[in-house]
A protein has these predicted regions:
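Alpha-helical architecture
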Residues: 2-3, 42-43, 60, 64, ...
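Anionic group-transfer/hydrolysis microenvironments
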Residues: 47, 68, 187
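Membrane-interface loop-to-helix entry segments
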Residues: 1-10, 58-69, 127, 169-170
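Membrane interface segments of multi-pass transport proteins and intramembrane proteases
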Residues: 50-57, 96
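Alpha-helical transmembrane segments
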Residues: 8-39, 73-79, 85-89, 94, ...
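Alpha-helical transmembrane segments within multi-pass membrane transporters and channels
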Residues: 39-51
């Protein structure tokens, strides 16, 4: 439903504030990106409802705000985070295939954040069809972040150990829980869409 993301965002934030380590830079970054993009989406939906305007805020303004929010978040993350190999791009299943992005890390990260946000938006529409894909992706990210943040598992699987990333699995679990809570509200509408 319209403004349904606000309910998901609320459930997510309650869980993260209760269970996650709020001194962890990874959690703070995830909270910032999620809340800022969530508020932007809520404002867009609010404008659609209040002014009976199906387009909400203009596409140019929306993408501009997304770029600004993402650049600010990634820049702060790079400035405050203390990861030795932060700008390295690792390829799974290839032990020595590592690309150091350098300062290209910031635009690359911004592109990934904005692309992910808009992909979920396009998948979702008004009938909640993005819930299951979001749950599956969050489960994969939870596994990857837990393994990367565990020195024993990361050494065994020959992937880089990054201290503190295991905390992101709590954030991903909160995403899964809040999405599962919304499934009962979106199931009927999605089923009707499939029949038509």
């Amino acid at each position: 439903p319209t403004m349904g993301g606000v309910i998901i965002l609320f459930g997510l934030l309650i869980s993260v504030l209760l269970w996650a380590d709020l001194s962890n830079i990874n959690i703070l970054f995830c909270i910032y990106i999620t809340v800022s993009f969530g508020l932007l989406g809520a404002f867009d939906d609010f404008k659609k409802i209040k002014y009976s305007n199906s387009s909400g805020i203009s596409s140019k303004l929306k993408i501009t705000l997304q770029i600004l929010l993402a650049v600010l978040g990634v820049s702060l993350f790079v400035y405050y985070a203390d990861f030795q190999d932060m700008t390295n791009l690792y390829f799974p299943f290839f032990k020595n295939l590592i690309i150091n992005l350098g300062w290209f890390f910031i635009p690359f990260s911004v592109f990934v954040i904005i692309g992910s946000s808009n992909a979920v938006n396009l998948t979702d529409g008004l009938d909640g069809l993005a819930t299951v894909p979001v749950i599956l992706v969050a489960a994969c990210f939870a596994f990857i972040s837990y393994v990367t943040g565990n020195i024993v598992f990361s050494n065994y699987l020959q992937i880089p150990y990054i201290e503190g990333t295991g905390e992101i699995s709590i954030f991903c679990g909160a995403i899964i829980g809040s999405c599962l809570g919304s499934v009962s509200y979106t199931h009927l509408r999605a089923h009707e869409t499939q029949r038509n």
